[in-house]
A protein has these predicted regions:
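Acidic ATP/Mg2+-coordinating residue in the GHKL
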Residues: 36-37
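Cell-envelope/extracellular polymer assembly enzymes that use nucleotide-activated donors
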Residues: 5-7, 31
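Catalytic-site signature of metal-activated, phosphate-bearing donor transferases
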Residues: 60, 66-68, 78-239
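Active-site regions of enzymes building and remodeling cell-envelope glycoconjugates
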Residues: 30-32, 46-54, 143-148
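A short acidic, amphipathic alpha-helical/loop segment
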Residues: 21-25, 58, 84
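Active-site-proximal specificity loops/subdomain of glycosyltransferases
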Residues: 40-66
Length: 244
């Protein structure tokens, strides 16, 4: 089915199969946009009709569609997401924004954080928010956010080297977003940021779990936050050196 009222914005960290899967999962959207804050994908081949925005921007600036759906490039929309969204946005009393669960799959486990992020919002509300642990969503909404049952899915590679490489790319994207917001890295960011990111994974509800997978996924989440702040720190140092 098609949902022309929705523009799907993919917050990209890298290209290749992960980005292609994210875009394919929202082929039903009226518009598909790749947001590339770190400007790394200027030569990435994209499907016909997909627009690329290199550099930081708010989703509301990228489209005239009434609604915006936000995905990461490692996420895919499950098969029942379009119907759930179509029903929600067509309601006369539609909320200004909706929370959508995110299920993390990897290393034999499937985890779902207890609080779903806001990933669907009216265009006027569609601003990126970077929360504790550097989780990115849309918000805060002007009113109470609704809740969809259908989920977005994150499929973590089972190969440690590939997982670390992808997390490093995500950290580069997050550092670009933080720099655009003039965030100044502090020592406590390097300490508390990874703890918050890992903590979100540790308290996630296990849909399916094997052995120590939860701890391993928590370590990876903490690693991403630590590297993002380290990259922001280095970026600030380079900017200061250029001024002198």
């Amino acid at each position: 089915m098609r949902v022309p009222a929705v523009a799907a914005v993919v917050l990209a960290s890298g290209g290749g199969a992960r980005l292609a899967s994210a875009l394919a999962s929202v082929a039903w959207a009226g518009e598909r946009i790749v947001l590339d804050p770190a400007a790394r994908l200027t030569r990435e081949p994209l499907p016909r009709g997909v627009r690329l925005h290199a550099g930081a921007a708010e989703p509301l600036e990228l489209t005239t569609a009434p609604w915006v759906l936000l995905l990461g490039d490692g996420e895919i929309a499950s098969a029942d997401v379009p119907a759930a969204i179509a029903t929600a946005v067509a309601e006369p009393g539609a909320r200004p924004a909706y929370r959508i669960p995110v299920a993390v799959q990897g290393f034999g486990a499937t985890l779902r954080p207890p609080r779903a992020p806001i990933r669907l919002a009216r265009r006027s509300e569609a601003r990126l928010r970077i929360g504790p642990g550097l989780a990115v969503d849309l918000g805060p909404p002007a009113g109470h956010a609704g809740q969809l049952r259908s989920a977005l899915i994150v499929r973590t590679t089972e190969r440690l080297g590939e997982a670390v490489e992808h997390l490093d790319a995500q950290a580069t994207t997050l550092a670009a977003l933080l720099a655009e917001r003039r965030r100044r890295p502090r020592l406590w960011h390097l300490v508390l940021g990874p703890l918050a990111a890992g903590g979100h994974t540790l308290v996630a509800r296990p849909v399916r779990q094997r052995g120590s997978a939860r701890w391993f996924l928590a370590v990876l989440a903490g690693y991403r936050a630590a590297v993002a702040y380290a990259k922001l720190w280095e970026r600030r140092r380079a900017e200061s050196a250029e001024r002198w």
